[in-house]
From Swiss-Prot:
Key word Ligase present: yes
InterPro entries: Cyt_trans-like, Pantoate_ligase, Pantoate_ligase_C, Rossmann-like_a/b/a_fold
Protein name: Pantothenate synthetase
Function description: Catalyzes the condensation of pantoate with beta-alanine in an ATP-dependent reaction via a pantoyl-adenylate intermediate.
Positions that bind ATP: 26-33, 144-147, 173, 181-184
Highest taxon listed in the record's lineage: Bacteria
General remark: The reaction proceeds by a bi uni uni bi ping pong mechanism.
Gene (UniProt): panC
Organism phylogeny: Bacteria, Pseudomonadati, Pseudomonadota, Betaproteobacteria, Burkholderiales
């Protein structure tokens, strides 16, 4: 596996490749990331991964400086997955001058849910993903359903900007107790880690309520929020949305069997966790 930081060297290395499968990450790789590499291999060859902790998608009071950086461990894991190239640019490589041009998603998708609580987050994501796509020029790219809203925004962005990249969705990988794998799980104390699976259990309860015939979605959401708060969480949202566009479903959508998803974000101690479950 070649480890490359220069954009020009990356382009030289990939010249002539027209079936590249790309997996962008921020590093601190876990089994969820590695499952993305394996899925990428099913859809293209060679597989290219990137590791870049993107300052543009962190808010002023978020964990950019604390975000775990484990490049050497990550390299060893990617070598075992037979990744062809790891693109690991420095901040100077990606942003040699102030990034004045930004890619901003539409407000109806980028300013809800995560976008409401993390202003500018999806503009940072879209900007860096567009730039990475321009560098790698993949045929397919793999994104996890764990970041459901991000997946939808990136997919729509590629469609609307006519980027010739097929976005492949990967299922969320979970620990045996149900907790979705995340690089931020390492922030959890032992007691918090024992409590953390309750987030996925709460989503499962929401799904059961909807599938069981309850139609007052606001009441279901409020019940879930209260349940988490009573256990010491600080939830930002528990929200049932249409999978197609993340708009809140009407009664007609529910009766018609519209595919839904419930999404949540909540703080446990100092650690903010997100998760979702399709209904």
């Amino acid at each position: 596996m070649k480890v490359i930081s220069s954009i020009q060297e990356l382009r030289d290395q990939l010249r002539g490749q027209n079936r590249t499968a790309f997996v962008p990450t921020m590093g601190n790789l876990h089994d969820g990331h590695l499952s993305l590499m394996r899925l990428a291999r099913q859809h293209g060859d060679p597989v290219v991964a990137s590791i870049f902790v993107n300052r543009l998608q962190f808010g002023p009071n978020e964990d950019f400086d604390q975000y775990p950086r484990t490049l050497q461990d990550d390299i060893e894991k990617l070598q075992k997955e037979n990744v062809y190239v790891l693109f690991a640019p420095t901040e100077r490589d990606m942003y040699p001058e102030p990034q004045e041009y930004r890619v901003q998603p539409p407000h109806d998708l980028g300013d809800i849910l995560e976008g409401e609580f993390r202003p500018g987050f999806f503009t940072g994501v879209c900007t860096v993903v567009t730039k990475l796509m321009a560098c790698v020029q993949p045929r397919v790219a793999v994104f996890g359903k764990k970041d459901y809203q991000q997946l939808m925004i990136v997919r729509r962005m590629c469609q609307q900007l006519a980027l010739p990249v097929e976005i492949i969705a990967a299922e969320t990988v979970r620990d045996a107790d149900g907790l979705a794998l995340s690089s931020r799980n390492r922030y959890l104390s032992e007691a918090e880690r024992a409590e953390a699976p309750e987030l996925a259990k709460t989503l499962a309860q929401v799904r059961s309520a909807v599938l069981g015939g309850e139609r007052d979605l606001a009441a279901i959401e409020q019940r879930a929020l209260a349940h988490l708060a009573a256990r010491g969480w600080k939830p930002d949202y528990v929200s049932i949305r249409r999978r197609a566009n993340l708009v809140a479903p009407s009664a007609a959508h529910i009766e018609a069997g519209e595919p839904l998803v419930v999404l949540t974000a909540a703080k446990l101690g100092a650690t903010r966790l997100i998760d979702n479950l399709e209904i």
